[in-house]
Amino acid sequence: MKTLCVLSIFLALLGGLCTSSTTSTTATSNGTTSTLNTTVSSVASTSTPSTESTTTTTPTTTNSSASSTSVTVASTATTSPQTNSTTSLTSPLSSTFSSTSANVSSSTTTTTSSTTKSTSSTKPKTSKNNPKTQEAGAEAAVMISLGILYLFILLLIIFVIILICFIRRRQHHQHGGGGGGQGGPMIPLDVISLESGLGESWSSE
């Protein structure tokens, strides 16, 4: 009995080492998972019931991991069910890698199609809005030029009025200053020459 217990413990330790080695190799490489899983099954067939209990725990872990990966594939990848069936036959790591690569390709295609649609929809809008903007710009330029012209005309009229008023005041001051200095109204030179000529003619007679 003691020898059987020792042998069972020894075989259990060997089974645990084999399962740990298979799990470590599945994490590192994807191609050797199928062969290592067969070795685990062979060890389980030769081991005692205690080792069978340990081997039943390892498939549950692998099944749980595979189910979790299949859930993630179903939630993320909506491309085709055939990819899900093929990934269930392969190892879980390879299925996750293939599902992520498929998702990346599908997302990139959707983004490119959306960008092309947006660019094609924006081009006719800009072509339609161009004449309106040009007309608005032309109207604004015409209004600005008319406003500048009106201001120039008003300034010119004000300048002419000020110049006329200044000339009239200057003439008025000249006439008023000459009359005040002589003590009487200014007499034109033509009248003075006529009077002198008449005086000379009367004196000669």
From Swiss-Prot:
Cellular component aspect of the GO annotation: host cell membrane; membrane
Coiled coil start-end: none
Signal peptide (from-to): 1-19
Keyword Transmembrane attached: yes
Keywords: Host membrane, Membrane, Signal, Transmembrane, Transmembrane helix
Bias (Low complexity): 40-133
Membrane topology: Single-pass membrane protein
Positions of transmembrane segments: 147-167
Keyword Membrane: yes
Compartment(s): Host membrane
Region (Disordered): 40-135
Protein name: Uncharacterized gene E9 protein
